Swiss-Prot record:
Residues 1-11 have a biased composition (Basic and acidic residues). InterPro entries: WD40/YVTN_repeat-like_dom_sf, WD40_repeat_CS, WD40_repeat_dom_sf, WD40_rpt, WDR55, WDR55_POC1. Keywords: Cytoplasm, Nucleus, Phosphoprotein, Repeat, rRNA processing, WD repeat. It is found in: Nucleus, Nucleolus; Cytoplasm. GO terms for cellular component: cytoplasm; nucleolus; nucleoplasm. Gene3D superfamilies: YVTN repeat-like/Quinoprotein amine dehydrogenase. Residues 1-31 are annotated as: Disordered. WD repeats lie at residues 36-75, 82-121, 125-163, 166-205, 208-247, 250-289, 293-332. It comes from Bos taurus (Bovine). The keyword Nucleus applies. This is WD repeat-containing protein 55. Residues 12-21 have a biased composition (Acidic residues).
Length: 382
């Protein structure tokens, strides 16, 4: 059993306390404690097998923490200050032995996870600041920069395997199909890009949307592609129809800055208003709030290897953990029957609305109740 799961199960254990014990038992929390940084985090990633969380901040520092539900046991293991400018993305290798980081300083770094030692540096990996990073397999990774450039790298070789520039603006996010053949890119030019990394060729760009595309993820077992945008709208594409959107729906948020899939139908979206919304795809609706960074934009989201926790980072310089149990157990149809028009967002974790009266008046998502109902009735089928 995973250590984190063991700790959570211990809350319900029946072991009797030792009457002679002098020390109070350690408190077991629902989630690990918040981690406070000295600067906002701009990159966030969980280890694929261990209870470790990596973060890169706007000062260029990289941190690795061990996390635990046992109070006082979430600790910094090491930090690295090798980047000269903001560290914008971090990712663990498939075996968890390396941490890859990219930066505004145009460099890619490979760090040893156990020791925090810099093992390799590609100093001028791009001609422009690097903004996004995606692991393809144990040897290959993809990077995207501020001018729309995409590069594919094999860690066993010196130069890039592929170098393309089809977008006119920054690469905000990237995703990969299950066969690891097609690379999908979300760009500031409002287009979804499709690149065949097996044949190392460009496939197509979608029609531009009215705002920047800020995030991209596959849903519905790869049949749908969801893109978040700077205008607070989620755009949906059919897998075989990347040229134009198949559907869209707006959240009451100025911008969707990051998204992470939780199940094949549910994703979490972080927004500039500080709220982390749980969103169901087909039928399309916001089902509640997982958590929040009080009035501070949510920059990054990551899901733990066991699926129990969502981690988030915001401008408040905190890394927060959210319990996913209630969201995973949610039945969307039941939620529809209980939903009250104009009511507040449903809390999907014990901490969802824990800190600020600002959120008490946050209303149900959508342009208005009538429009939301019309969208739901249209979107209930694939």
């Amino acid at each position: 059993m995973d250590r984190m799961c063991e700790e959570r199960a211990a809350e319900d254990g029946s072991d009797e306390e030792d009457p002679d014990a002098t020390e109070a038992p350690a408190r077991i929390r629902d989630t690990p404690e918040d981690i406070v940084l000295e600067a906002p985090a701009s990159g966030l990633a969980f280890h694929p097998a261990r209870d470790l969380l990596a973060a890169g901040d706007v000062d260029g520092d990289v941190f690795v923490f061990s996390y635990s539900c046992q109070e006082g046991e979430t600790k910094e293991l090491w930090s690295s200050g090798h980047h000269l400018k903001s560290c914008r993305a971090v990712v663990f290798s498939e075996d968890g032995q390396k941490l890859v980081t990219v930066s505004k300083d145009k460099a890619i770094h490979f760090l040893d996870v156990e020791l925090g030692r810099l093992e390799r540096r590609i100093s001028k990996a791009h001609g422009a600041p690097i903004n996004s990073l995606l692991l393809v397999d144990e040897n290959v990774l993809a990077t995207g920069d501020d001018t729309g450039g995409i590069r594919l790298w094999d860690q066993r070789k010196e130069g890039p395997l592929m170098d393309m520039r089809q977008h006119e603006e920054y690469i905000a996010d990237m995703a990969l199909d299950p066969d690891k053949k097609l690379l999908l890119t979300a760009s500031g030019d409002g287009c979804l890009g499709v690149f065949n990394i097996k044949r190392r060729r460009f496939e197509l760009l979608s029609e531009p949307q009215s705002g920047d595309l800020t995030s991209v993820t596959l849903m519905k077992y790869g049949r749908k592609v969801a893109c978040g945008s700077s205008e607070g709208t989620i755009y949906l594409f059919n897998w075989d129809g990347f040229g134009a959107t198949s559907d869209r729906f707006a959240l009451r948020a100025e911008s969707i800055d990051c998204m992470v899939p939780v199940t094949e139908s549910l994703l979490c979206a972080g927004s500039t208003d500080g709220v982390i919304r749980a969103v169901n795809i087909l039928p399309n609706r916001v089902v509640g709030s997982v958590g929040q960074h009080a009035e501070e934009p949510v920059e990054n989201l990551a899901l733990s290897h066991c699926g129990c926790f969502l981690a988030s980072s915001g401008h408040d310089q905190r890394l927060k953990f959210w319990d996913m149990a209630q969201l995973r157990a949610l039945v969307v149809d039941d939620y529809r029957r209980r939903k009250k028009k104009g009511g507040p967002l449903r809390a999907l974790s014990s901490k969802a609305w824990s800190t600020d009266d600002f959120f008490a008046g946050l209303r149900e998502e959508g342009e208005d109740a009538k429009t939301l109902e019309e969208e739901e009735s249209e979107d209930d089928s694939d």
